[in-house]
């Protein structure tokens, strides 16, 4: 069983990620989103819902948001609103201008034809436009959200099968990580724990390989890779963020690992000997 310090490091690192996602530029927020000039201490984050394909749950509704994502954001001080799948365009526009950021969660729907994909594209485009105008609107994609954002940027399905459902890995940091928006303020002990202990949970069958990333000019010019992992000798991307040189005010970050899974979910797996007493 992993030591208490290691698990505490994992939770602390996960919450540090959230602090970055939730940080709102006070000037931009006040100017464009009606926040007080002192900034927004309780930012509102939208979580994209997705279609429910489990028939036994259809009695409760046709779409869902995993509760662990809500708990994860609320644990960092955010308020959460659902982004539903069947709203009119004007309703999405109103919702976009009423929130401070968006999270595209993990799941299992089609990256091109699902309602999840359709609504993700709407908020992706609106976020790009807002950030280009000087607003600060962060977008975080986890697992399926990571895959969706790479598709929206590249226009191609570039996934490869890595069979990484139910594994935990340490992170292999790239040279870009040290000065990245995401990791530059991490304490050294947290970075060391991430690099040496298997603290990132993975529940995905598909990944973006470094080879496919490097070959795609749109991805290469938009994102920089911060961490990778290797499965069966295939190197795949586990964390990346927007290139600041090209898109200075665009806080888009993506992760294939699921940071909220261990502290917020009761699911267990033989590959994870992580206690849930935190």
Predicted features by range, described:
Residues 2-241, 246-250, 256-278:
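N-terminal beta1-alpha1 cap of cysteine-dependent amidohydrolase-like domains
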């Amino acid at each position: 069983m992993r030591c208490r310090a290691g698990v505490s490091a994992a939770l602390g690192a996960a919450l540090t990620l959230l602090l970055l996602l939730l940080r709102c530029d006070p000037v931009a927020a006040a100017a464009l989103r009606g926040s007080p000039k002192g900034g927004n201490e309780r930012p509102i984050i939208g979580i994209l819902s997705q279609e429910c394909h489990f028939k036994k749950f259809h009695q409760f509704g046709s779409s869902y948001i995993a509760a662990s994502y809500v708990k994860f954001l609320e644990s960092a001080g955010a308020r959460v609103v659902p982004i539903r799948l069947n709203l009119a365009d004007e309703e999405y526009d109103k919702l976009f201008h009423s929130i401070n950021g968006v999270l595209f969660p993990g799941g299992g729907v089609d990256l091109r034809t699902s309602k999840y994909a359709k609504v993700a594209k709407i908020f992706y485009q609106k976020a790009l436009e807002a950030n280009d105008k000087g607003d600060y609107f962060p977008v975080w994609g986890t697992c399926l959200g990571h895959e969706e954002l790479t598709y929206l940027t590249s226009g191609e399905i570039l996934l490869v099968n890595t069979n990484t459902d139910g594994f935990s890995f340490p992170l292999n940091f790239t040279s870009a990580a040290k000065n990245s928006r995401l990791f530059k303020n991490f304490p050294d002990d947290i970075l060391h724990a991430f690099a040496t202990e298997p603290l990132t949970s993975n529940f995905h069958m598909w990944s973006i390989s470094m080879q496919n990333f490097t070959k795609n000019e749109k991805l290469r010019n938009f994102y920089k890779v911060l961490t990778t992992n290797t499965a069966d000798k295939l190197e795949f991307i586990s964390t990346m963020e927007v290139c600041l040189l090209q898109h200075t005010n665009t806080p888009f970050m993506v992760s294939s690992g699921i940071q909220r899974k261990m502290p917020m979910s009761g699911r267990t797996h033989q590959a994870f000997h992580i206690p849930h007493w935190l």
